[in-house]
Structure formats: structure tokens, C-alpha cells
């Protein structure tokens, strides 16, 4: 038996090609009209929570004079959200390389406000012809159980219901507004636009791309449990649903607690989240020493999601019949996976793998 197939069969994953009534999904229309909306709503209800109502923000921009030795324009873009309860402003930074017509844009949800940042090698990114649109996740809403402040405070009613938005959903909400803004910019209207994030923000990037089909690609770096990694069959040393929910319940909908001791009861697994991105491009990055992020289950999720790309006549995920090893970079399909040496980090190496794979996939080189 195939090595990979054997590993997948052990996990007894819900079948993406079979709907809730037991009918086979054999066409793109059956997927887009029935199964995709069903899974999307299920994942929001049971895992991340429903996104809050749309608010059109007031936007203001200002130019930063220091601009990478003249190689880029650098703007501060502020999003001011107001509703009947309150108002809140989120600062972001947009860096666009000069002289690059229709360059790809990457929305990056970051752990800090500064650019460059240890996770954003900005000059290397613009030298590769990519624009970067960055936001500090704590400037959206704080990474804790406080739902009274930040964007969350505009919607918090005093209690969280079963499908109330967790912090990951709020971070995704902001990223979707950043996409709205880029679509109004002349420099980005005809450009590829992707989203990237690391760890909990890699989870956020995947959710954002799953919900908003305007994203052309998504880079999920070391996103692990409740991101790119399957929840069933958690590998030795990997983070389980119990581990993540008992430490970070505020990331998720309260409904998610039902499954933390029995992930096999989940009516979906994370390959379904990846499948919601089809037929667009997904790039999953893992690090060998980052066992907590469960590299094998991130790899297997890529394999398990691939049949949905095949429905579209796409390549999906292409790899040899083996589990991944250090140095592997499978980027011949629409789903890409690489495993580097090192620890839990968004490195320059990861950025370069993602950028080169995007260039290859979209024939930019």
C-alpha cells in the first residue's frame, strides 16, 4: 500500500467528495453550489466563529519619507471603523517597489508594527518585485480574552455565544478590509494579491483566503494545529485540540470546545479549510524542529485536500510517495509544501521559497 495513503487511512478523515447526504461530489458545480458553502459555514460555526457585520471604514494615507534607498514607496494607511457603539482605527503600512508594473501584493498579518521586522525582510521582498501590506495583529484586536476593545469591541455584546467570532476571525476580518482597499488602488487592480502569516497568523491567513476568493494565493507558515495540520491522528509531540483550546480559547468559537477531547467527532478536518481555497494556490511551510506544529499532519492535509483541485482539472498536490524530509520543496502543483531545518520562525528562507514558488506558478519568471 502507498505510504501516504496508509497514513491518511489511519486518520479516517471526512470525505471531501461526499456530501452530508452521502452523494458523491463529481463536478465543480456540485462543489461550489453545495459542498463548499456547507463546509464554509460549518467551519465558521464550529471552529473560528462567524465574522462580524461589514463596516465600511474611513481611510487616510500618508507617505513615509524613508523608503529603502529610493527603491519603494512607503505609505501609512489608517482604517477608521465606526458603528453605533464606538469607533476604532487600525494602522497599516504599504510598501510598493518602484518601477515594477503589476507586481504581486502580499497582505501580511504580523506580530509587530515595525517594518522591516524580524518576520518581514522588506528589502528582500521588494527586491524580488513584491509589494507588502502589513498590519500588527494586536492593532486589530489584542491576542487575549479581551473582547471589549479593538475591533472586537465594536461588536461585543457582553457574552460570547457558541458561534461567536474568536480572535482569528477578527484578524481575518481586517485582512479582508485590506483586500478591499487594494482593489481600489490603481497599482493593485490588475495584480496578484496574496496573504501570508506565521503560526496563529498562518491560521488566520488560511481562513482569510478560504473566505475571500479574491486572494490569488496564501502562504501559511508553521500554522500547525487548527491551521494547516490535520486534527485527527495528531503526531507525537504535536499540538492537539486540547492543548490549543485550553491555552487559547479566545482564538476560536466557543463551540470548538466540544471537540477538544474527541477530534474524531469534528464533522470536518483541516483539509477542508485548505480545500475552500481551491482552485487557487496554497503554500504551506514547515520547520523540522517545530514538532509542535505537527509537520507530518500539515503535509498530509495538503495531500488530503488535493482532490478538490483535481475536480477543477488542476494539478493539486504533487509529491513522491514518502513522508517529507528536511530540504523537500514540493512546488510543482497548486498546493506547495516545504520542510526546512530549524525552529518555529518565519525566516528569509521561507520568504524566498514562497516568492520563487509564486513566480514559478504564475509564470512571472
Question: What does each model-identified segment do?
Answer:
Residues 86-90, 96-105, 128:
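Proline/glycine-enriched tight loop/beta-turn segments at coil->beta junctions
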Residues 1-89, 359-364:
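N-terminal targeting or regulatory segments adjacent to alpha/beta-hydrolase or S9 domains
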Residues 220-273, 298-320:
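Mobile cap/lid helix-loop segments that gate and shape the active-site cleft of serine hydrolases
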Residues 291-301, 347:
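Conserved alpha/beta-hydrolase "acid-adjacent" motif
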Residues 278-293, 340-341:
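Conserved strand-to-loop "acid loop" that flanks and positions the catalytic carboxylate
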Residues 101, 107-185, 224-227, 231-232:
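Cap/lid segment of the alpha/beta-hydrolase catalytic domain
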Residues 115, 119, 176-238, 262:
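Primarily recognizes the serine-hydrolase "nucleophile elbow" in alpha/beta-hydrolase
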Residues 247, 257, 302-365:
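C-terminal catalytic histidine-bearing segment of alpha/beta-hydrolase fold enzymes
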Amino acid at each position: 500500500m502507498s505510504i501516504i495513503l496508509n497514513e491518511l487511512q489511519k486518520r479516517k478523515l471526512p470525505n471531501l467528495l461526499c456530501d452530508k447526504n452521502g452523494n458523491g461530489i463529481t463536478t465543480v458545480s456540485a462543489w461550489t453550489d453545495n459542498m463548499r458553502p456547507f463546509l464554509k459555514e460549518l467551519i465558521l460555526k464550529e471552529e473560528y466563529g462567524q465574522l462580524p457585520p461589514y463596516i465600511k471604514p474611513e481611510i487616510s494615507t500618508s507617505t513615509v519619507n524613508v523608503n529603502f534607498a529610493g527603491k519603494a514607496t512607503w505609505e501609512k494607511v489608517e482604517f477608521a471603523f465606526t458603528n453605533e457603539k464606538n469607533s476604532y482605527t487600525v494602522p497599516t503600512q504599504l510598501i510598493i517597489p518602484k518601477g515594477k508594473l503589476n507586481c504581486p501584493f502580499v497582505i501580511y498579518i504580523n506580530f509587530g508594527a515595525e517594518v522591516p521586522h524580524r518576520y518581514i525582510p522588506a528589502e528582500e521582498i521588494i527586491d524580488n518585485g513584491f509589494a507588502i501590506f502589513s498590519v500588527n495583529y494586536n492593532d486589530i484586536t489584542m491576542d487575549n480574552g479581551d473582547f471589549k476593545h479593538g475591533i472586537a469591541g465594536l461588536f461585543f455584546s457582553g457574552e460570547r455565544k457558541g458561534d461567536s467570532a474568536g480572535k482569528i476571525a477578527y484578524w481575518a476580518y481586517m485582512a479582508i478590509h485590506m483586500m478591499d482597499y487594494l482593489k481600489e488602488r490603481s497599482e493593485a487592480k490588475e495584480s496578484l494579491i496574496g496573504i501570508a502569516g506565521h503560526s496563529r497568523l498562518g491560521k488566520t491567513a488560511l481562513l482569510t483566503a478560504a473566505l475571500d476568493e479574491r486572494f490569488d494565493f496564501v502562504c501559511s507558515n508553521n500554522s500547525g494545529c487548527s491551521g494547516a495540520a490535520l486534527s485527527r491522528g495528531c503526531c507525537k509531540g504535536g499540538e492537539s485540540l486540547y492543548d490549543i483550546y485550553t491555552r487559547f480559547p479566545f482564538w476560536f468559537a466557543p463551540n470548538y470546545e466540544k471537540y477538544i477531547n474527541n477530534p474524531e467527532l469534528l464533522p470536518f478536518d483541516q483539509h477542508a479549510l485548505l480545500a475552500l481555497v481551491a482552485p487557487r494556490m496554497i503554500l504551506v511551510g514547515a520547520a523540522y524542529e517545530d514538532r509542535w506544529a505537527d509537520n507530518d499532519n500539515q503535509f498530509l492535509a495538503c495531500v488530503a485536500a488535493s482532490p478538490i483541485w483535481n475536480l477543477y482539472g488542476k494539478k493539486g498536490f504533487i509529491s513522491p510517495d514518502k513522508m517529507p524530509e528536511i530540504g523537500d520543496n514540493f512546488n510543482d502543483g497548486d498546493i506547495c509544501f516545504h520542510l526546512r531545518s530549524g525552529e518555529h520562525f518565519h525566516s528569509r528562507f521561507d520568504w524566498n521559497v514562497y516568492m520563487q514558488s509564486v513566480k514559478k506558478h504564475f509564470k512571472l519568471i
